[in-house]
């Protein structure tokens, strides 16, 4: 499964709303909401770039792959 760390990154930077993050990054609110709650099925490179630039992080800090032990 893919896990989003957006909530953690927002907390570290004291960003309290997706609306504020949207204004700061130029990423749409609905796209951020899908990443935040884990319902996103794809993320555009431009979205990843904007978020990594804003949070000064690597892709692996934003999202991570966690193997599902039940699928082995």
What residues fall within each predicted segment?
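Residue-level signal for the short linker/turn that defines the boundary of a DNA-recognition helix
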Residues: 15-17, 43-46
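DNA major-groove recognition helix of helix-turn-helix/homeodomain DNA-binding modules
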Residues: 46-61
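Short alpha-helical DNA-recognition segment
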Residues: 15-34
């Amino acid at each position: 499964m893919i896990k989003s760390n957006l909530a953690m990154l927002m907390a570290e930077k004291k960003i309290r709303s997706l609306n504020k993050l949207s204004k700061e990054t130029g990423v749409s609110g609905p796209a951020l909401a899908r990443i935040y709650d884990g319902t996103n099925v794809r993320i555009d490179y431009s979205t990843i770039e904007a978020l990594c630039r804003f949070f000064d992080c690597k892709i692996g800090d934003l999202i991570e792959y966690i193997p599902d032990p039940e699928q082995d």
